[in-house]
Amino acid sequence: MRVTDELVLFWGANDVYSNFYYFPFVHQGIRFIWSEQAVMYRKAKLFGADAIASKILKANSPKECKVLGRSRQIPFDEEVWVKNRERIYKEVLREKFSYARTENAILSTGDRLFAEASPFDKIWGIGLAEDHPDAENPDKWRGLNLLGKVLTEIREEIKSGRGGNGLG
């Protein structure tokens, strides 16, 4: 993770803002280990792929969750996913960042913009590594940075008193 005056550039399992970060939390009454697991579970359920959703709950890593979430056994519809993906991410991450430790972490970023500095992800990330010369210039990002936008929205909700529950 790299923090500048204006950005929080993150990517990888060691960064609390990453969906691969180990942080058990409860979402919709189910205990998840990583937010990636919760998102992929919700994705599978959205498309009625209950068998895949069950496998996601038993996964041993966030990478395994991601692979299962992309399974051809899910009757995926791009239009349906695009309509629902940001809402699902926001609902999941709102829960993850409702615990005191994660809430404090997200609030500690001030007003900086979150940027998932994944060189591989052009939807949820910026499409650039954190050490890329253009990583600090949002106009030059190659990705949509949807994860960064969702995290920024959640932080603003918490700051305005509309989010968080102060749990452990």
Regions found by a protein language model. Give the residues of each.
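Charged, low-complexity intrinsically disordered segments
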Residues: 1-168
